Every structure is written in structure tokens, then in C-alpha cells.
């Protein structure tokens, strides 16, 4: 009995150590520890709580090593467990569930689990865990189109990481998120400054994958200013080195579309649709499908059907910024076809969506 307890304590300690390396963004060290832990998998499976803890951290490892490959099914194994109430495991369950929902673009669900996780943070009384929570929540807020709140949480996370040795990569990741929110706020100079700071940090540690994630964001920064050629230069580097990076593929396709390069745009759209179908990413499936219709110069009525399907999803997830963007594109299309009643209808829908975006970001 005592031997088993000691063995469980050692495994628990090893699992804690594994998670700490993930918090530090140390991929190679985390991979080595994963292999060491997998040698003890038969012992881990004997204990329900250890098995749940391992499954949670295994999901977190997948987020660390290839977050873009996370699908709706990636949490199935964890969902098969009975999750205890009011413990560090219940915190990790809701926290990681929120991360999973964010990555799979189920933002309403993500919000619910972030709220539950925040109430359980007391069971993990670690300052660095708070920083990790703030960082992940800032990503959610960014995707949820609340850039000011995202900046607040990214700043809180960065402050804690800065005060602890060995978290330089996390500081770089915070700078990356600060830059992203600055783009939403059209503070382009500040965004570029934050992105360059993040790249400097990642290059210092030879973190090529992280540099690529910032290159993607730089592409978006330049795309937001209609600097299509410059945007494509950064985005093509990402899509060449990470062919499954569907977000970079979409941004690159959209910039080629702006330049009237129909064939290149079409090729990228088909690649993106295949990837998004495989991983079940609903949001980007809509983005690619709408861009495909625009690239094919679909008639207004056909475009209307496709955009309305997207708007139904965007409204459900309260992504009103996209509802506004696509309603305005549809209004412009109807206007060009001299259908002024429909044009007026969709310009008005875009205006309503803009108001909802403003209300969502307003002080509560």
C-alpha cells in the first residue's frame, strides 16, 4: 500500500513537472517528459484521478505542440471521466475545456467554462497559474472581438511572467497578443512594435514555430491596411512552412483576391476548405465559403444564401463584427446590381451588427 502511494506521489510530481515545462513553453523538455511519463502509463491507468490528470495534460501538450490540429473530438477522452467537484482537477477540466472551445471556435461555450474555471482558481494557488489563465482568457477575448479587455488581461499576464525567471517565451507570446488587439483597434504602429518585440524574443531562443505565428499576425496587420503585397510576403512564408495553417491560408487567399488573382485565390480556398472540413472548424469553413463565392463573382442572390448561412453562425457565437463585414459586402453587391431595396436592407443589417459589437465591448 505504502509502495503504491509513494509511486503515485512520484507520478503526480512528474505530471506537475510536465505541466510546468508547458507553462514555460519548453517544447523539447515537455516532449522528453511525456516519453518518460508514458513509460508509467500502466500505473497511471490504475488510478482514476491520475488518469484524468494525465489526459488533461496530454490535451494541453497537444495545444502546445500543434494547437491548429485541435478538433471538436479532442476532448472526448477527458469527457469520459467523472470530474470531481472543487479540486485542482475540476479547475483544469473547465480551464482546458475553455481553451478547447476557443480553439474550435465555440465561443459561447468557451465563455461559460472560463467563468467556471475562474471560480475554481483558488484550488491552484499559484501566481503563474493565474498568469496562464489571464493569457488564455486574453486570447478568447481577442477572438470574441473585445480588444480592450484582451489588452488588460495580456498586460496582467505579462507582468506576472516578467516577475518570474524562465518565462521569456511567455512574455513574447503576451507581446504577440497585445499586437493582435492593437490591430483591431487600428493602432497599427503599436501593433508592429509589439510583433517585432515578440519576434526578437523568439529568435533569441531559436523558436522558429513561434516566429511563424507572429509572421501570420504581421500578415494580418498589413492586410488590415490593404498592403496586400507585403501581407502576402509574410503569409506565404507561413503557408509554405506550415501547410495546414488554415488561418494564414485564408488571409493569403483574401489578399490575392484583392489583387484580382482569381486562380491563386481559388487554389488556396480549396486547400483551406479541405483542412477546415477535416478538423471541423465551422467559423473558417464559412469564411472560406463566402470568399469562394466572392472570388467566383457569384450573383447577389447566390451570395446572399451563402452569407446568410455564415451570419446565422456568427450571430449565434456573437461574432457581430463578421456579421457587419459580410452584410456590408452583400449590400454592396446588391447595390451594384441596382437592387436598392436589398442593398438598403443589408446596409442596415451591417449597422445593427456594428451597434451590437459596440454594446458587447461597452463597460458593464
Report the location of each language-model feature:
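Amphipathic alpha-helical segments of tetratricopeptide repeats
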Residues: 35-42, 75-83, 115-126, 155-166, ...
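Flexible inter-repeat linkers and adjacent short helices
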Residues: 1-97, 269, 306-309, 314-317, ...
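Loop-centered beta-sheet repeat module
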Residues: 151-221
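Alpha-solenoid helical repeat architecture
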Residues: 6-10, 46-51, 85-92, 125-132, ...
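Long, mid-chain structured domain cores
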Residues: 58-160
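Tandem amphipathic alpha-helical repeat scaffolds
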Residues: 14-24, 55-66, 91-106, 132-145, ...
Amino acid at each position: 500500500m505504502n509502495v503504491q502511494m509513494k509511486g503515485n506521489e512520484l507520478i503526480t510530481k512528474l505530471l506537475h513537472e510536465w505541466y510546468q515545462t508547458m507553462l514555460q513553453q519548453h517544447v523539447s523538455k515537455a516532449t522528453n517528459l511525456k516519453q518518460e511519463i508514458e513509460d508509467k502509463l500502466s500505473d497511471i491507468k490504475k488510478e482514476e484521478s491520475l488518469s484524468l490528470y494525465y489526459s488533461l495534460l496530454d490535451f494541453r501538450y497537444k495545444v502546445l505542440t500543434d494547437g491548429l490540429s485541435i478538433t471538436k473530438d479532442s476532448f472526448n477522452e477527458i469527457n469520459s471521466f467523472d470530474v470531481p467537484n472543487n479540486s485542482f482537477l475540476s479547475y483544469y477540466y473547465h480551464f482546458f475545456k475553455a481553451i478547447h472551445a476557443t480553439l474550435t471556435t465555440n465561443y459561447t461555450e468557451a465563455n461559460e467554462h472560463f467563468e467556471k474555471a475562474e471560480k475554481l482558481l483558488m484550488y491552484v494557488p499559484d501566481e503563474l497559474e493565474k498568469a496562464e489563465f489571464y493569457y488564455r482568457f486574453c486570447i478568447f477575448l481577442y477572438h470574441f472581438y473585445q480588444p480592450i479587455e484582451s489588452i488588460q488581461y495580456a498586460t496582467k499576464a505579462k507582468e506576472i511572467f516578467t516577475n518570474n525567471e524562465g518565462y521569456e517565451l511567455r512574455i513574447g507570446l503576451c507581446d504577440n497578443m497585445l499586437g493582435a488587439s492593437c490591430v483591431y483597434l487600428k493602432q497599427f504602429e503599436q501593433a508592429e512594435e509589439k510583433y517585432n518585440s515578440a519576434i526578437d524574443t523568439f529568435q533569441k531562443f531559436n523558436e522558429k514555430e513561434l516566429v511563424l505565428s507572429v509572421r501570420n499576425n504581421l500578415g494580418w496587420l498589413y492586410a488590415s491596411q490593404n498592403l496586400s503585397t507585403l501581407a502576402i510576403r509574410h503569409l506565404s512564408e507561413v503557408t509554405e512552412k506550415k501547410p495546414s495553417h488554415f488561418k494564414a491560408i485564408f488571409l493569403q487567399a483574401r489578399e490575392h483576391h484583392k489583387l484580382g488573382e482569381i486562380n491563386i485565390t481559388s487554389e488556396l480556398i480549396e486547400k483551406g476548405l479541405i483542412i477546415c472540413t477535416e478538423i471541423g472548424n465551422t467559423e473558417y469553413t464559412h469564411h472560406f465559403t463566402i470568399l469562394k463565392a466572392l472570388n467566383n463573382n457569384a450573383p447577389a442572390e447566390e451570395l446572399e444564401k451563402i452569407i446568410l448561412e455564415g451570419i446565422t453562425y456568427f450571430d449565434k457565437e456573437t461574432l457581430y463584427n463578421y456579421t457587419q463585414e459580410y452584410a456590408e459586402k452583400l449590400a454592396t453587391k446588391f447595390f451594384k446590381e441596382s437592387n436598392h431595396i436589398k442593398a438598403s436592407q443589408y446596409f442596415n443589417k451591417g449597422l445593427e451588427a456594428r451597434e451590437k459589437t459596440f454594446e458587447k465591448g461597452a463597460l458593464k
